[in-house]
């Protein structure tokens, strides 16, 4: 999920990593072999018994039957569309690691330092929650990448992704407090063309994905408030490939440069240098790919998508350093337009302001809605469709009152100039004591 510049901050081939079908077959084969072995042992016992009518008249040995081992069921695999909870695919609650990147230069000692390795082991529960969320994200997005096609409505696409995330986390979010335990980390963003971020359809939206569209798909999955924030861009015309490649390369540059004690400004400078080395030809005209300078990456806190630190995507400015144990969303945005976004179109994204100053509310609708938000979302972002899903109606007046009172922050869509095209790629990284883990990395990007 995009973070605006510091001044704005103030206000799915699913690989079934649960278990390969071949491994399941092998396990089943071993179980059958074990049973055959049991019978074979029984025959040997019987064969050693004295022959019938032996002069010794020895009593016949009774054949002892060993209890048959139960055959193990085959390993579960993910359904299509994804509906099998990730916890059922990984019953031991050990989830796949992300991409492991060793620290470099003065931090290279961390990889083998015993104290740091001990601290790393202490973070296992925290990491498993992140890895579980990341596996949810990978399986959902890989399904989405294969199945999103021009002609579908944005509502159909968004709800398909969100339903899958809820199913795979095992939290439908309909019971009070359930969404705080797991589910959507924030609404599924589907920003088209010149719109770079924070667009998701409201109820009644009829917008249809077109063949010539460039769509940013930005969604989060969380377990216990550990939000995995990752985004990719889809285009159906290869003319936009250089734009997508520029932004993907820039994001990977940011990930490579990020680390403990690294200054934000240095990361931004490296991202900008990579991004702006690309250009794209559209309708016979060459366009330099520009960084959208007032959109940033950000750190992530528990249940809070924008933690307060920003990771710029241009040079200059913030000298703040990244610190051990922090979690960051490294995201970059490229544009063929001005490289600057403004608020535009109908608002859909909202979030409770953490530690907001209490304000007396006169509207009963605002009081009731605030109670619903606190119990169902807390500080997690939500959208109007989520309120509709909970059975809320006629809430707009109360919602606007919460916004004007500074209790809820609205996040309008952020757009460059009309006629331009924008792209986004994003990953969540964890700065572990020993290594940097790109939690959301997959085979796709």
Curated annotation (Swiss-Prot):
One GO MF term attached to the UniProt entry: initiator methionyl aminopeptidase activity
Residues that coordinate or bind a divalent metal cation 2: 229, 298, 331, 426
InterPro entries named in the record: Creatinase/aminopeptidase-like (IPR036005), Met_Aminopeptidase_Type2 (IPR050247), Pept_M24 (IPR000994), Pept_M24_MAP (IPR001714), Pept_M24A_MAP2 (IPR002468), Pept_M24A_MAP2_BS (IPR018349), WH-like_DNA-bd_sf (IPR036388), WH_DNA-bd_sf (IPR036390)
Catalysed transformations (reactions): Release of N-terminal amino acids, preferentially methionine, from peptides and arylamides
Signal peptide residue numbers: none
Sites where the protein binds a divalent metal cation 1: 218, 229, 426
Record text on cofactor binding: Binds 2 divalent metal cations per subunit. Has a high-affinity and a low affinity metal-binding site. The true nature of the physiological cofactor is under debate. The enzyme is active with cobalt, zinc, manganese or divalent iron ions. Most likely, methionine aminopeptidases function as mononuclear Fe(2+)-metalloproteases under physiological conditions, and the catalytically relevant metal-binding site has been assigned to the histidine-containing high-affinity site.
Localisation: Cytoplasm
Acidic residues bias (residue ranges): 34-46
GO CC entries: cytoplasm
Span list, region Disordered: 1-92
GO process annotations (BP): proteolysis
Cofactor(s) listed in the protein's UniProt record: Co(2+); Zn(2+); Mn(2+); Fe(2+)
Extent of Basic residues compositional bias: 59-74
Source domain of life: Eukaryota
Keywords: Aminopeptidase, Cytoplasm, Hydrolase, Metal-binding, Protease
EC number: 3.4.11.18
Biological role stated in the UniProt entry: Cotranslationally removes the N-terminal methionine from nascent proteins. The N-terminal methionine is often cleaved when the second residue in the primary sequence is small and uncharged (Met-Ala-, Cys, Gly, Pro, Ser, Thr, or Val).
UniProt similarity note: Belongs to the peptidase M24A family. Methionine aminopeptidase eukaryotic type 2 subfamily.
HAMAP family membership: MetAP_2_euk
PANTHER family in alphabetical order: METHIONINE AMINOPEPTIDASE 2 (PTHR45777:SF2)
Name the record gives this protein: Methionine aminopeptidase 2-2
Species the sequence originates in: Aspergillus terreus (strain NIH 2624 / FGSC A1156)
